[in-house]
Design a protein with these regions (language model features):
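Membrane topogenic/interface segments and analogous intrinsically disordered interaction regions
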Residues: 1-301
Length: 301
């Protein structure tokens, strides 16, 4: 009887501790993996081994399943936590139009839908760094030390750029956009919660994604696809492309709001040129180091 009670309590505490162990495990994996070098097996040999031994693919899928499960657990917890602050977030988002009392719900479930949308997006934003860490933990065994450190640095930088883009949308771009839309042709507009929240959160999301442009250029330059010189030479075409992108993202057709979107994107483009130069320089140094080591080994032979 005593053993049964002990086993029952042990299993109970294991179940209680399982979510916390699942959360801590990726951070432990990061510390362990960051000092291990990957196996330099050619990609063709890897595919051949997978075909010959399907169990290898099953092992990778099982590892991916564990990472996805942990990410979903953290996302669910983040959404539940954010639900306690969702009303305050809704009030903050509705400040540009005079508060929540300025919204008019037509459908019965409209307010609930807007509430759940903000709760999910807030929880996703909170959980996004952890989800990125789970992706990193899955890819980590095949990365070199320098690549691991670079990815770990990119995660907070990407998060900061996204938050900067969302803040730029809310504090600078949203007021003139709403002023144009709500007073267009002098027609009185009844603002619905679902439409307004979808409009604001969608605009903040896509502008936040647009602010990731320097990181994308840095990655392409590190892979040798682009370089700073080609970006400088093609700046006119880049500005033209930015104009089309701003026209697609901007919710209005007036040049003021389009210019508000274009200006930071142009600044980000020229910032990307500097980051591309850094990435190209680092890539050249690594290639020179590899060639030097190869030449030294040939002389020894």
């Amino acid at each position: 009887m005593r053993d049964l009670i002990r086993r029952t309590f042990s299993r109970f505490f294991l179940i209680l501790a399982w979510p916390f162990r699942m959360i801590v495990k990726p951070f432990t994996a990061i510390r362990t993996f960051i000092n291990n070098e990957p196996d330099d097996t050619p990609l063709v040999d890897v595919f051949a081994a997978t075909v010959e031994q399907p169990s290898l693919l099953i092992d990778h899928l099982e590892a991916l399943r564990r990472h996805i499960l942990r990410a979903l657990v953290v996302l669910t917890l983040a959404v539940l936590v954010s639900m306690a602050f969702t009303r305050y977030i809704l009030e903050w988002l509705s400040i540009p139009i005079g508060g929540l009392e300025s919204l008019q719900a037509i459908e019965v479930t409209e307010s609930v839908g807007a509430y759940m949308r903000v709760a999910f997006l807030s929880g996703f934003t909170i959980a996004l760094p952890y989800i990125a860490l789970e992706i990193f933990a899955f890819l980590n065994p095949g990365l070199r030390r320098r690549e691991r450190v670079t990815l770990l640095m990119i995660i907070p930088i990407a998060t900061g750029l996204f938050i900067t883009g969302a803040a730029f949308t809310y504090y600078i771009m949203l007021d003139p956009a709403l002023d144009f839309l709500l007073h267009f042709l002098g027609i009185e507009t009844a603002i619905r919660p679902s439409n307004y929240i979808r409009f604001v959160t969608g605009l903040m999301f896509w502008i936040g994604i647009a602010f990731q442009f320097p990181l994308i250029i840095y990655a392409l330059a590190a892979l040798g696809i682009v370089n700073a010189r080609s970006l400088i030479q093609g700046w006119r075409f880049a500005i033209l492309g930015i104009a089309f992108a701003a026209a697609a993202v901007t919710p209005t057709i007036d040049p003021v709001n389009m210019g508000l979107v274009m200006l930071p994107m142009i600044v980000l483009y020229f910032l990307s040129i500097g980051m591309a130069g850094l990435a190209t320089r680092g890539r050249s140094r690594r290639q020179a180091k590899v060639q030097h080591e190869a030449g030294t080994s040939d002389l020894k032979d």
